[in-house]
């Protein structure tokens, strides 16, 4: 594993732990070159997932890209990193269980919204406003109304 601080390719694992009922491994690493310590996470990927984007192009599913969009929605919200990882694991599990090797970006967005709706309503609204291309305050009012009814 490459050190994110100095670029050295020779790092050592100091500690490994199974997390989230064994669905991923948390590793504490040490760089012998610069002395930096950092954490990595390994996740299980059962099959290659291809995402069909709105414009028709196709690309490999990028967990980190999806995770970043969720983290933006959750910024300054009282949700732990572990809970975000659990949310993403749940989304990926649903994708792999329900769909073939290809899935639309629309379905992925809906699965993320479904998970966020149960985790944090504010993050759900933030994510939905970007995902659903809200144009004005009426879009927010309509979504919030659907949450309270």
Curated annotation (Swiss-Prot):
Zinc finger (unnamed): 3-34
Cystines in this chain: none
Entry's Gene Ontology molecular function annotations: ATP binding; DNA binding; zinc ion binding
Cross-referenced InterPro entries: ATP-cone_dom, NrdR-like_N, RNR_NrdR-like
This protein's UniProt keywords: ATP-binding, DNA-binding, Metal-binding, Nucleotide-binding, Repressor, Transcription, Transcription regulation, Zinc, Zinc-finger
Cleavable signal peptide: none
PROSITE patterns xrefs: ATP_CONE (PS51161)
Superkingdom of the source species: Bacteria
Record's cofactor remark: Binds 1 zinc ion.
Cofactor(s) demanded: Zn(2+)
Residues in ATP-cone domain copies: 49-139
Pfam family, one: ATP-cone
GO biological process per UniProt: negative regulation of DNA-templated transcription
Function summary: Negatively regulates transcription of bacterial ribonucleotide reductase nrd genes and operons by binding to NrdR-boxes.
Family classification: Belongs to the NrdR family.
Protein name from the UniProt record: Transcriptional repressor NrdR
Organism: Neorickettsia sennetsu (strain ATCC VR-367 / Miyayama) (Ehrlichia sennetsu)
């Amino acid at each position: 594993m490459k050190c994110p601080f100095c670029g050295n390719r020779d790092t050592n694992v100091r500690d490994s732990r199974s997390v989230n009922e064994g669905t991923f491994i948390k590793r504490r690493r040490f760089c012998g070159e610069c002395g930096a310590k950092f954490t990595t996470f390994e996740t299980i990927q059962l099959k290659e997932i291809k995402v069909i984007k709105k414009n028709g192009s196709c690309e490999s599913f990028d967990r980190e890209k999806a995770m970043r969009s969720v983290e933006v929605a959750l910024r300054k919200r009282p949700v732990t990193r572990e809970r975000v990882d659990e949310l993403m694991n749940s989304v990926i599990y649903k994708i792999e269980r329900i769909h073939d090797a290809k899935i639309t970006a629309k379905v992925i967005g809906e699965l993320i919204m479904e998970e966020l709706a149960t985790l944090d309503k504010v993050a759900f609204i933030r994510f939905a406003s970007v995902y659903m291309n809200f144009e004005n305050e009426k879009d927010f009012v309509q979504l919030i109304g659907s949450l309270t009814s």
